[in-house]
Design a protein with these regions (language model features):
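Short, conserved catalytic/metal-binding micro-motifs enriched in Asp/Glu and His
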Residues: 1, 15-22, 32, 299-303
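Intrinsically disordered, low-complexity segments enriched in proline/serine/threonine
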Residues: 7, 30, 36, 91, ...
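Cleavable C-terminal sorting propeptides in eukaryotic secreted/cell-surface proteins
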Residues: 285-326
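Cleavable N-terminal signal peptides of Sec/SRP-targeted secreted and luminal proteins
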Residues: 9-29, 289, 313-319
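Mature extracellular/extracytoplasmic regions of secreted and cell-surface glycoproteins
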Residues: 25-288
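Intrinsic disorder/low-complexity signal
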Residues: 5, 13, 30, 323-326
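Bacterial N-terminal signal peptides that target proteins for export
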Residues: 3-14, 307-309
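Acidic/proline-rich low-complexity IDRs
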Residues: 13-17, 22, 45, 54, ...
Length: 326
């Protein structure tokens, strides 16, 4: 089986995750989903899209590029596949299948939860930082052709199942939509490797057609609509809005070809990701251009504190006490 090794799970980490699982059931769902969020993702919609079939419709081979929004890594010695250590056979990677264009509003290009930043924008799609700060996946690297060489991912984001506080713990156990991302030094564009993964018991392998589905689930969640993977081409475009913490984002999406191959060549997990005789990836990259169209009267993390259940404030203290026992 083709795989990438996963970091060994320690007793401490497993204990923290078990505690987090219990905390998920304690925090009321009505409090865990901020009233200011109007994004349209749901568990049912997520499962529905996951059942979609693969596609192989990208046939154009010339590079399609949005001027000024990003530089193709391929133009300067970089790659559009991540670098995964320890694969068999060696040299396999995962596709950088979503790009947040540097033509987006500058606030969205800042790695922050505040002021409408990237992390707040990702919460429109239910993508949050990892469970209690515990990184369970193996690190991957990417070379974006920006003079930095091979760079480790900034971080991994996981689907929070509607609970923005500790819901990513559920994704760690159950699997689902997740992504790694890197920031191109020359443009400030974000390059993301998005996929749908299996549960923890399955070693977080990628589900059949999981790279294409992950890309399209993210696009659908950000634009508030279902994306039919089977009908996509390099002329497909989508637009839609989503809100989180009183920030409303307009997302315009262009699917482009020429950056990735319509192929299984060099793709990690290709044997399990291929579906119905179709290749592991369809060769399409979703390029997002994002504008903030509405803002709260006052911004910043402190404005959200009254909405946070008291138990989430106490969690760090509880974890510190537990860690002292190990």
């Amino acid at each position: 089986m083709v795989y990438s090794p996963k970091t060994s799970t320690t007793t401490t980490t497993l204990s923290l995750l078990l505690i987090a699982t219990h905390l998920i059931s304690i925090i009321p769902s009505t409090q865990a989903s901020p009233a200011s969020s109007s994004s349209q993702w749901s568990d049912n919609a997520l499962r529905s899209v996951e059942r979609a079939e693969a596609l192989g419709s990208a046939v154009k081979t010339s590079l399609v590029r949005r001027a000024g929004g990003y530089n193709s890594p391929l133009d300067n010695g970089g790659y559009m596949l991540t670098i995964v250590n320890g694969t068999y056979p060696a040299g396999l990677g995962e596709p950088l299948n979503v790009i947040l264009s540097a033509d987006s509003d500058k606030e969205v290009l800042v790695k922050s939860l505040d002021d409408g930043g990237f992390l707040n924008y990702m919460l429109v799609a239910g993508q949050g930082e990892e469970c209690l700060g515990q990184h369970l996946g193996s690190d991957q690297s990417a070379n974006l052709g920006d003079g930095k060489g091979n760079v480790t991912e900034v971080e991994e984001l996981r689907y929070n199942y509607g609970n923005p506080y500790i819901g990513t713990c559920q994704e760690t156990f159950n699997g689902g939509l997740h992504l790694r991302y890197w920031i191109q030094n020359t443009t400030n564009a974000y390059f993301m490797a998005v996929s749908v993964e299996m549960d923890l018991n399955s070693g977080h392998d990628i589900v059949p057609n999981g790279y294409n589905l992950g890309r399209d689930q993210l696009v659908g969640n950000l634009t508030g609509q279902a994306i039919d993977t089977n009908t996509l081409t390099n002329t497909s475009t989508f637009s839609g809005t989503g809100s989180y913490e009183n920030y409303t984002y307009q997302t315009d999406v262009q699917y482009v070809s020429g950056l990735l191959k319509n192929s299984s060549d060099d793709i990690n997990h290709y044997l399990t990701v291929e579906e119905n005789g179709r290749p592991a990836i369809d060769g399409l990259v979703a390029v997002l251009t994002v504008k903030i169209t509405a803002r709260p009267q006052s911004s910043g993390a402190w404005s959200a504190i009254p909405q946070i259940p008291m138990i989430t404030v106490l969690v760090p203290l509880l974890l510190s006490a537990i860690l002292s026992l190990f």
